[in-house]
């Protein structure tokens, strides 16, 4: 059922305040520095991104994303740099984004299956200027148990990824290596609970 629901919304990821999908963004000045080219990593990710996660395009060139900042549980200031040494699947979502809401149980299942000392699904809520309790209520009502509570209520995280040309709308998902370098990116939802996603993550963890 989840795969079917996601398939029905795959082309309908949301750009609040703008059109739905299809509009490329031009990276602004102050762009993140590029990481050293690693053809082997790009080739491995491209080979593993099939089926449910075929839209996860390998980063060519890669970008250094350690500076992306957000809040962790209890409001603790964090950045991707705090996850150095771990592979991260960074997902930006909002409670008003229907495809995001449908995708969350699959992300939770992926964290339950693959989350360990070397990997974490970091799902960051980007609801801005709204009732922040709405996020916790949604997570509780949806039965999200494995994902930690990450948030960035000022939209600066989304805008940073948008400036880099990575985010066109929500949800947006970035696979980030142990060194903080982008491995691959995707706009729109996916079935993260399936075998294809697990294979991609296991490949990334081995890089």
Describe the residue ranges of each PLM region.
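Conserved redox-active cysteine motifs that mediate thiol-disulfide chemistry
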Residues: 84, 92-109
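Conserved hydrophobic packing residues within short motifs/helices of P-loop NTPase cores
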Residues: 88-90, 122-124, 174
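Structural microenvironment flanking redox-active thiols in thiol-disulfide oxidoreductases
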Residues: 101-143, 153-161
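N-terminal targeting signals for export/organelle localization
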Residues: 1-65, 207
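Loop/turn elements at helix/coil->beta-strand transitions in domains of secreted/extracellular proteins
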Residues: 85-88, 117-120, 145-147
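Short pre-active-site segment immediately N-terminal to redox-active cysteine/selenocysteine motifs
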Residues: 86-88, 92-96, 128, 169
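Thiol/disulfide oxidoreductase modules built on the thioredoxin-like
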Residues: 141-146, 151-203
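A short beta-strand-turn-helix
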Residues: 57-62, 67-88
């Amino acid at each position: 059922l989840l795969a079917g629901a996601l398939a029905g919304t795959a082309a309908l990821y949301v750009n609040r305040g703008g059109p739905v999908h299809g509009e490329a963004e031009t990276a602004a000045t102050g762009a993140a520095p590029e990481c050293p080219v690693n053809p082997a990593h790009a080739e491995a990710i491209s080979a593993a991104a099939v089926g449910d996660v075929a839209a996860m395009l390998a980063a060519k060139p890669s970008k250094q994303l350690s500076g992306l900042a957000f809040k962790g549980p209890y409001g603790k200031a964090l950045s991707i740099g705090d996850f150095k040494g771990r592979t991260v699947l960074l997902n930006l979502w909002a409670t008003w984004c229907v495809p995001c809401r449908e995708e969350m149980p699959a992300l939770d299942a992926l964290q339950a299956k693959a989350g360990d000392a070397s990997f974490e699904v970091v799902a960051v809520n980007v609801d801005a200027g709204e009732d922040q309790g709405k996020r916790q209520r949604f997570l509780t009502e949806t039965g999200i148990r494995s994902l930690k509570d990450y948030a960035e209520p000022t939209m600066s995280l989304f805008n940073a990824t948008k400036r880099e040309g990575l985010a066109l709308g929500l949800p947006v998902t970035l696979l980030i290596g142990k060194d903080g370098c982008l491995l691959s990116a995707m706009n729109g939802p996916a079935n993260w609970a399936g075998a294809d996603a697990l294979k991609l993550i296991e490949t990334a963890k081995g890089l």
